[in-house]
């Protein structure tokens, strides 16, 4: 199978380049990550992240034939050759297919991704009704792979100002949580021309999410809440 892979080491290379590979795959190699691991045996200088191999950790997110995705759940049979692999767009390249996720996680942490509740804790846990719990479906499953945010032009242009689809999806996950008591502060922190409203609903984030989530709906709901409290 033929591959064309982005190669760049900022400490050694003057500019990025593409390197071509043609390797024979084992019949058991079904996913793109399997092929990358086999390529790593052939060329141990190739750098990429991976961990769980199950689409849970989000470590092996990359741009695959022009579309962001996870290597571990991308079936080789679905890919046209040569398979072109690039690092996630919009983030600094550390080396080859590895990007610096610092800005992505800075925006994520800025939305306070945890429950805020200063009420005296109950003897047991803070309970939710089945309906309240169900309202979090489609929100809590985010694995922070950054496929969505790095597919978003607004995040490319303003990574230091726009929270991005992943961060805003998680912001709504806590806004929608019946156990949280920080609603007004959460909305106040997003009341900004850039942090929330740079989303133009082009839905690239929805198209690439490996978990099938819909950040655009979550972002739209936050915008609606902003408008309602302003009138």
Give the positions of each predicted feature.
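Ferredoxin-type iron-sulfur electron-transfer modules in oxidoreductases and energy-metabolism complexes
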Residues: 30-43, 86-231
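Active-site phosphate-binding and catalytic loops of NTP-dependent enzymes
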Residues: 43-49
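Short, contiguous acidic and Ser/Thr-rich linear segments
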Residues: 19-30
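Short, structured protein-protein interaction patches enriched in aromatics and acidic/basic residues
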Residues: 52-61
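A generic structural motif
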Residues: 75-76
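Eukaryote-biased recognition of intrinsically disordered, low-complexity regulatory segments
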Residues: 1-21
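Short strand-turn-strand beta-turns centered on an Asx-Gly dipeptide
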Residues: 24, 63-67
């Amino acid at each position: 199978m033929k591959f064309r892979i982005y190669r760049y080491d900022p400490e050694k290379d003057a500019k990025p380049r593409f390197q071509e590979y043609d390797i024979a795959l084992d019949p058991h190699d079904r996913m793109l990550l399997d092929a990358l691991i086999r390529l790593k045996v052939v060329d141990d200088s190739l750098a990429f992240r991976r961990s769980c191999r199950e689409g849970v950790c989000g470590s092996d997110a990359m741009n695959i034939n022009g579309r962001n995705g996870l290597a571990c759940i991308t079936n080789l049979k679905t890919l046209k050759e040569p398979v072109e692999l690039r690092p996630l767009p919009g983030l600094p390249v550390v080396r080859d297919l590895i990007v610096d996720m610092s800005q992505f996680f800075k925006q994520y942490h800025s939305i306070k991704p945890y429950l805020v509740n200063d009420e005296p804790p109950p003897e047991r846990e803070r309970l939710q009704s089945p309906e309240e719990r169900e309202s979090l479906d489609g929100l809590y499953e985010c694995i922070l792979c950054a496929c969505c945010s790095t597919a978003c032009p607004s995040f490319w242009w303003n990574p230091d100002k726009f929270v991005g689809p992943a961060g805003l999806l998680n912001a709504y996950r806590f806004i929608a949580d019946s156990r949280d008591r920080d609603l007004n502060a959460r909305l106040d922190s997003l009341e900004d021309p850039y942090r929330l409203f740079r989303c133009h609903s082009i839905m690239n984030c929805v198209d690439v999410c490996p978990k099938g989530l819909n950040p655009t709906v979550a972002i739209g709901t936050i915008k609606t809440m902003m408008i309602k409290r302003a009138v």
